[in-house]
């Protein structure tokens, strides 16, 4: 009910009351009606103001700071799409899904990155300048059933440094998807084994980085971009 309707109802109530001549009771009644009218008008006005300015009523939900999920890879690729200037070398390459016999890296594809001097040469990322670099890589293996001989997957990120020209492992991991052999006659179920590695290293200009696996035929290329290799200067 609006404020105007409340005021009108109070006036109509006053007119509907029988008017009596003078006396203490009549005076008290008039005072009570006046006080009631004032309280109704004041209350309605206050309620309208509180609702209008949002002091009461439904409140908008806001996410607290720090609860937003952030994908570091998406954040890195945004530098390219947004055109934000940056002099930091960066690279993000993905596996070639057409070449299932080996792990071949591609840079001229969607969601890949090669900026500020970074190069992809002979399946290796070449560092353009000295400094600290974040190196990361992810691979995903898949198969059907578990053989009698345990399957071991290795994922290695290596560096051939210009200073000593030897290949050194920077990151290395070994995993097995099978705990035991699939029983004879049992249904062979699919399995998936991801490996993710990352670390910060001091590199020199001309250092060559590579990411390799021992059994590339088990790599899962069902979705583009889920097998990747990247370097970001810090």
Swiss-Prot record:
GO cellular component: cell surface; extracellular space; plasma membrane
Residues with glycosylation annotation: 82
Family matches, as PROSITE patterns: THD_1, THD_2
Keyword check for NADP: no
CDD domains per the UniProt record, alphabetical: TNF (cd00184)
UniProt main location, coarse: membrane
Post-translational modification comment from the UniProt entry: The soluble form derives from the membrane form by proteolytic processing. The membrane-bound form is further proteolytically processed by SPPL2A or SPPL2B through regulated intramembrane proteolysis producing TNF intracellular domains (ICD1 and ICD2) released in the cytosol and TNF C-domain 1 and C-domain 2 secreted into the extracellular space. The membrane form, but not the soluble form, is phosphorylated on serine residues. Dephosphorylation of the membrane form occurs by binding to soluble TNFRSF1A/TNFR1.
Any one biological process term the GO annotation gives: positive regulation of NF-kappaB transcription factor activity
Modified-residue entries (Phosphoserine), positions: 2
Gene Ontology MF terms in the entry: cytokine activity; tumor necrosis factor receptor binding
Disulfide topology: 146-178
Cytoplasmic side: 1-35
UniProt site positions, description: Cleavage: 34-35, 39-40, 49-52, 78-79
Localization annotation: Cell membrane
Topology in membrane: Single-pass type II membrane protein
Extracellular side: 57-234
Keywords per UniProt: Cell membrane, Cytokine, Disulfide bond, Glycoprotein, Lipoprotein, Membrane, Myristate, Phosphoprotein, Secreted, Signal-anchor, Transmembrane, Transmembrane helix
Residue ranges of domain THD in the record: 89-234
Membrane-traversing stretches: 36-56
Pfam families: TNF (PF00229)
Record family assignment: Belongs to the tumor necrosis factor family.
Biological function: Cytokine that binds to TNFRSF1A/TNFR1 and TNFRSF1B/TNFBR. It is mainly secreted by macrophages and can induce cell death of certain tumor cell lines. It is potent pyrogen causing fever by direct action or by stimulation of interleukin-1 secretion and is implicated in the induction of cachexia, Under certain conditions it can stimulate cell proliferation and induce cell differentiation. Induces insulin resistance in adipocytes via inhibition of insulin-induced IRS1 tyrosine phosphorylation and insulin-induced glucose uptake.
PANTHER family for this protein: TUMOR NECROSIS FACTOR (PTHR11471:SF23), TUMOR NECROSIS FACTOR FAMILY MEMBER (PTHR11471)
Binding partners and assembly: Homotrimer. Interacts with SPPL2B.
Name of the protein in question: Tumor necrosis factor
Originating gene: TNF
């Amino acid at each position: 009910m609006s404020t105007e309707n409340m005021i009108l109802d109070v006036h109509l109530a006053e007119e509907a009351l029988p008017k009596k001549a003078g006396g203490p009771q009549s005076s008290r009644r008039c005072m009570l009606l006046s006080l009631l009218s004032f309280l109704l008008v004041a209350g309605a006005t206050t309620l309208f103001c509180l609702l209008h300015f949002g002091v009461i009523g439904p409140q908008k939900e806001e996410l607290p700071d720090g609860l937003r999920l952030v994908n570091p890879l998406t954040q890195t690729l945004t530098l390219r799409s947004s055109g934000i200037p940056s002099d930091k070398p960066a690279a993000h390459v993905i596996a070639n899904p057409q070449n299932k016999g080996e792990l071949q890296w591609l840079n001229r594809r969607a969601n890949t990155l090669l900026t500020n001097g970074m190069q992809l040469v002979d399946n290796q990322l070449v560092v353009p300048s000295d400094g600290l670099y974040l190196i990361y890589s992810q691979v995903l293996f898949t198969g059907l059933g578990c053989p009698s001989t345990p399957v071991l997957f290795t994922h290695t990120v290596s560096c051939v440094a210009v200073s000593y020209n030897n290949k050194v492992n920077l990151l290395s991991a070994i995993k097995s998807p099978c705990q035991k052999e699939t029983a004879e006659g049992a249904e062979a179920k699919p399995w998936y084994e991801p490996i993710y590695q990352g670390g910060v290293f001091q590199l020199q200009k001309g250092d060559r980085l590579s990411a390799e696996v021992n059994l590339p035929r088990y790599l899962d290329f069902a979705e583009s971009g889920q097998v990747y290799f990247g370097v970001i200067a810090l």
